[in-house]
């Protein structure tokens, strides 16, 4: 496929992007190009240019529908030549492939197994025949390690059937900390890593903002410490804590106090310029009824308990800090920004507002969509960027939908995730540059519960706690200055 007068990059290549592109002929000798590019490096843009240079008829596979749409949008905005009909060369449907067809791994699996998915019915559909007829000779895999087991099988089956196909593999988060078997499976699919674009060089080039990681330590609460001491007295010969207790301490209520203090500090420093994101593991929907009830106990790590803790703090300090909740099953905004939300939504959909807990509807409200709600997350994200919300609370699953907001300048990781892949995804949301604030810097806060009783009781150091080891795993593959070396 000759892309002359069809696709041409309209921008200027960064130094690190040009370095990769200058070596394409060397990388492609084994039929596979495998690029590791930190979040914010223009990974999608590189992928499109590689397809253009290889002059391939390409099938691009991505993790989610959101990312699929981002690929198509990027091609149109940054590559498509003036006067070219996009529909003639771009497709999001396996049933109607074009020069570049972008689809999800889920759709691939549905087509390979000939079942009906949410968008299309693949019963009786011969994907391999369609791809052969379309002369697909380039397979571009975006973050292919984000796959369920059955998706892996479908991808491997497709790859076996496609002959003389060049593979382009793009990722920000290689599964470095996976099992040897998983790593070997990944490398067999993508090939050995050809080039890595690192975070420090992206900061140097101005593609990512300067940022600092902080570790905020806390001790367990008195109640948690008493629970541990009871366990130790009942098991005097035990050399380590029960895994359930370790898990309990990883979700220590002391971390709630840490989050409160960090939030107060950041808001005192930035006020209306604060764009803080707090990511946790659970929503804790059962605590919705506690919101607005001062007598209710909300000491639990989760989206809604954290929201209520911070709401009470803001109320007690007469602070005008505005909070928001952004999750798939619940969205909360300040009541005073309802009109701004409606204006942002426009004709994209219909919105309703309802009471949150026992709060008066003049403070905070829940937001729901009438019918399809796909437009709500982008709309609330826009409110966040526009400063109507200073602190946004959500779960890590939000990232799986390809969510992003370059305005974030403070991130609290209130999650027990220790894997490099997910940690890098979360951390990457805070270090992007933002056009509205060219001098943006960002803080990333990691929470760790220590055990002050450990050294005297078990003869080991406090940092041997599972929570501390999780932090070590999380940090292991991040590049930065070492404290001593």
Predicted stretch roles:
Residues 105-108, 113-169:
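SF2 helicase catalytic motif II
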Residues 109, 314-318, 324-483:
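Conserved RecA-like P-loop NTPase helicase motor core
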Residues 146-211:
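Post-DEXD/H (motif II) to motif III coupling segment of the RecA-like Helicase ATP-binding lobe
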């Amino acid at each position: 496929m000759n892309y002359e007068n069809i696709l041409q990059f309209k921008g200027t290549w960064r130094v690190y992007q040009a370095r990769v592109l200058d070596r394409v002929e060397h990388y492609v000798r084994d039929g596979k190009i495998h690029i590791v590019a930190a979040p914010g490096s223009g990974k999608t843009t590189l992928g499109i240019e590689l397809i253009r240079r290889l002059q391939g008829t390409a099938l691009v596979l991505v993790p989610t529908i959101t990312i699929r749409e981002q690929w198509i949008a990027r091609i149109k905005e940054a590559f498509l030549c003036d006067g070219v009909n996009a529909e003639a060369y771009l497709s999001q449907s396996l049933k109607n492939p074009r020069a570049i067809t972008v689809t999800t791994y889920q759709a691939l699996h549905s087509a390979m197994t000939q079942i009906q998915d949410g968008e299309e019915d693949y019963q009786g559909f011969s994907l391999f025949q369609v791809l052969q007829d379309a002369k697909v000779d380039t397979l571009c895999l975006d973050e292919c390690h984000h796959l369920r087991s059955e998706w892996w099988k479908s991808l491997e089956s497709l790859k076996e059937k496609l002959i003389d196909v060049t593979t382009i593999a793009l990722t920000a988060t290689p599964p470095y900390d996976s099992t040897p078997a998983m790593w070997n499976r990944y490398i067999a699919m993508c090939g050995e890593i050809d080039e890595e674009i690192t975070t420090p060089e992206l900061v140097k080039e101005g593609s990512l903002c300067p940022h600092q990681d902080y570790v905020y330590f806390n001790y367990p609460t008195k109640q948690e410490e008493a629970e541990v001491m009871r366990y130790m007295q009942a098991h005097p010969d035990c050399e380590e804590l029960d895994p359930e207790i370790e898990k309990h301490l990883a979700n220590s209520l002391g971390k709630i106090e840490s989050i409160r203090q960090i939030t107060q500090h950041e808001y005192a420093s930035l006020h209306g310029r604060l764009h803080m994101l707090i990511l946790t593991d659970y929503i804790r929907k059962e605590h919705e009824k506690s919101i607005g009830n001062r007598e209710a106990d909300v000491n639990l790590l989760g989206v809604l308990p954290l929201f209520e803790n911070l709401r009470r703090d803001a109320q007690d300090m007469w602070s005008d800090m505005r909070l928001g909740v952004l999750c798939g099953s619940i969205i909360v905004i300040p009541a005073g920004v309802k009109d701004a939300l409606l204006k942002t939504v426009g004709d994209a959909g219909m919105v309703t507002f309802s009471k949150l807990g026992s709060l008066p509807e003049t403070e905070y409200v829940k937001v729901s969509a009438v019918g399809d709600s796909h437009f709500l997350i982008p709309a609330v994200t826009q409110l966040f960027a526009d400063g109507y919300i200073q602190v946004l609370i959500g779960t890590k699953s939000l990232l799986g939908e390809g969510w992003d907001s370059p305005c974030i300048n403070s991130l609290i990781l209130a999650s027990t995730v220790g894997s490099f892949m997910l940690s890098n995804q979360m951390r990457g949301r805070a270090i992007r540059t933002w056009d509205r604030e060219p001098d943006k810097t960002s803080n990333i806060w990691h929470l760790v519960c220590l055990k002050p009783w450990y050294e005297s009781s078990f003869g080991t150091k406090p940092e041997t706690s599972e929570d501390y080891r999780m932090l070590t795993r999380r940090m292991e593959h991040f590049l930065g200055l070492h404290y001593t070396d």
